[in-house]
C-alpha cells in the first residue's frame, strides 16, 4: 500500500574538511534540503557542525555518521555533549555494538541525541529493540527485508530511514523512491542519492524539491532512460 505521494531525501557528504562541509551545507540549504547526512570523524566533527550551522542556519538538521570511528562510548558521549546544542538529528553507528548492545543503551540514557544502528539483519534489529539500544534504524536490502525490518521498527514505535540504493543512478533511484513510498514509518530523509550524479541517466526526472522527491505515477518505475 502506498503511504506517501512524496518522500523525504537528505543532502549527503563524504569525509571532508570542516570548511568543505560548511560549503556543502550552504549549497544544500539553498537547494531546499532540510537534513544533511555527513561522514563524520572525531577530530573535526565539532568544528564541522559549528561551521555548517553558521552556513546553513540553525534549522538545518545534521545526521552524524561516523562509521564507528568515534571508537567507544566515552568518546561518543563526550562529542555528543559538545554537539547537543546544535540541530543534531541522529548519531548513526558511532561505535561498534558487538558483542552486545549494553553500551548503546547506556549512550541513550546519557544523551538526548537519537541513536541509530545501521542494520539489515532482522534478528539484529529485534535484539536492538529488546535491549532498548536504538531510537530509529537505518535499514534496507531487498524489498522483503526492508518491509520486515521497517515493520518491526514500527511495531516498536520507531521511525526508519532507508538505504535501499545509496549512490546509484536514476533507475535505481526511482526504485528506491517507490520502496520508500510504501513504508509508513520511513519518515527520516533517505539515502537515495542519484541526484548527486553529474548525469543520472533519467534526465533529472526525480530532482528533489524542498527536500522531497515526488513518487512517479507513470507505469513501471515511472521514469524513462535518457538515451542521449
Please report, for each region that a protein language model flagged, where it lies by residue.
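N-terminal capping/lid subdomain adjacent to the active-site entrance of alpha/beta enzymes
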Residues: 1-77, 81-85, 202-228
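Hydrophobic faces of well-ordered beta-strands that scaffold small-molecule active sites
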Residues: 7-14, 34-38, 60-66, 91-92, ...
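Short, small-residue-enriched loops and turns at beta-alpha junctions
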Residues: 15-18, 41-45, 66-74, 90-99, ...
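Shared catalytic-loop signature of beta/alpha-barrel
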Residues: 81, 87, 98-114, 119-219, ...
Amino acid at each position: 500500500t502506498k503511504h506517501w505521494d512524496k518522500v523525504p531525501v537528505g543532502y549527503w557528504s563524504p569525509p571532508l574538511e570542516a570548511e568543505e562541509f560548511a560549503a556543502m551545507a550552504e549549497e544544500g540549504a539553498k537547494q531546499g534540503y532540510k537534513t544533511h547526512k555527513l561522514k563524520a570523524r572525531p577530530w573535526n566533527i565539532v568544528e564541522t557542525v559549528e561551521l555548517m550551522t553558521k552556513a546553513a542556519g540553525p534549522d538545518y538538521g545534521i545526521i552524524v555518521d561516523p562509521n564507528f570511528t568515534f571508537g567507544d562510548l566515552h568518546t561518543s558521549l563526550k562529542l555528543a555533549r559538545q554537539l547537543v546544542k546544535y540541530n543534531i538529528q541522529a548519531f548513526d553507528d558511532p561505535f561498534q555494538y558487538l558483542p552486545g548492545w549494553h553500551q548503546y543503551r547506556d549512550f541513550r540514557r546519557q544523551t538526548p541525541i537519537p541513536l541509530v544502528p545501521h542494520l539489515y539483519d532482522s534478528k539484529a534489529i529485534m535484539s536492538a529493540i529488546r535491549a532498548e539500544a536504538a531510537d530509529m534504524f537505518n535499514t534496507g536490502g531487498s524489498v522483503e527485508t526492508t518491509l520486515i525490518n521497517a515493520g518491526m521498527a514500527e511495531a516498536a514505535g520507531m521511525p526508519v530511514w532507508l538505504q535501499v540504493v545509496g549512490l546509484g543512478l536514476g533507475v535505481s533511484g526511482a526504485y528506491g523512491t517507490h520502496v520508500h513510498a510504501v513504508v509508513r514509518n520511513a519518515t527520516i530523509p533517505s539515502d537515495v542519492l542519484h541526484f548527486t550524479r553529474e548525469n543520472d541517466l533519467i534526465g533529472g526526472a526525480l530532482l528533489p524539491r524542498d527536500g522531497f522527491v515526488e513518487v512517479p505515477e507513470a507505469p513501471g518505475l515511472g521514469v524513462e532512460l535518457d538515451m542521449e
